[in-house]
Amino acid sequence: DEYCTDVVEAVMTILDQQGIEHPHIVTESGRATVAYYSILLFNILDVSIAETGESIPDVLPEDVPEPVVNLREVLQGLSVRNLQECYNDAVYYRDEMRQLFITGRVTLRQRTLADKYFWAIINRIAEEKEKLKHTPKELADIDSTLADIYYGNFSVFQSLPDAWAIDQLFPVMPVHRLTEFPSRKAVISDITCDSDGRIDKFIDPQGMRTSLDLHPLVDGDEYYLGVFLVGAYQETLGDLHNLLGDTNVVSIRISEDGSYQFVREIRGDSVADILDYVEYDPRRILEDLREAAERAVREKRITPSERYKILQTFEDGLRGYTYFER
């Protein structure tokens, strides 16, 4: 309110001095005015396919541990009327089996069998809960548990810090293959080593959802996603978490007739740039490696040709992008 008062008072004072009639002031400051100018694009590097609970044996082995028997009974007794109870039981017996495995009292095959039953239960619960008018809170996020993990070539902390810091929801979608049906439910992980480096909340017409419909990856083809409305401060707020630097930037001007031109291209940070930011001298590091390689040649641990390849590869790495390059 004080900000608005100051703006209006300043405008009013100047207009009064000039004898100009006061206008109606219409303004929208902040995210709504600047979010539209920027889009984050990144490729998907790999995917972890969610467990489906398939290939469950018809007959249990004789030496099967009791938690596996209990998990099977949970699966057989599961119905739309006892979803919450079955979920709680499945988690309990799954955790019990994990503890037995940690203490060496069950085999890896036995634990794997328990996991298959657990995921079969979770899949059944996900199917049955769609019949409920009101989903229990504990089951609301079960779709994200069953979602694939798509690994994106980006850093949440560098490019989408508000998604992590204040749970800001950004529109996310594929930017190609739009005539194909997106048959996989997924969450998105970045390439940092931080468990918070993921997007698992997405915009939905009903408010929010915990997975995103994406296409299956095709071997040999790139798959690109776009995150929209990121023009509001994301580039300014981003930081060097895991030493992942600024991304490549392309500025595009779109004409009224739909044509466009590339106005400016800015290369993202190189590995050498980031090392310099954190006060490591890339030239000193390279020189240290050069001396070590020379010493290895003199001691006949590597050949001169191998020395050249080592130094060339290291120099290429210093000049390279901080993100994955194919």
Model-derived regions: residue spans:
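Short helix-capping segments at alpha-helix termini
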Residues: I14-I20
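Alpha-helix-loop-beta-strand connector modules within alpha/beta enzyme cores
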Residues: D1-I14
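Charged (often Lys/Glu-rich) extended helix/loop segments that serve as interaction or gating elements
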Residues: I20, H24, S29-R326
